[in-house]
């Protein structure tokens, strides 16, 4: 996947939106809470980071090209140093799971506004 296909997939998730923040980072959010972040400028080390379960975090950071996401690792976010670190068939379900994890943690009032 590349940044455009990641963007297209993330924005296809119900009520997901995007926001540029911190200079050149593209945040993908649900209910104003981020579930994935893409670097808009290459060369920053991590191209894509996203939330995952503690078990998946431990598994993924053992793979080449995947590291604990800077500043977010304590919340079980991983960072891809290159887009081909994970094939599309593996990355899409991980992004969808990140979205669902954040959605499930939103306050009930916010979740109800999204329906």
Over which residues does each language-model region extend?
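Charge-dense, helix-prone N-terminal extensions
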Residues: 1-115
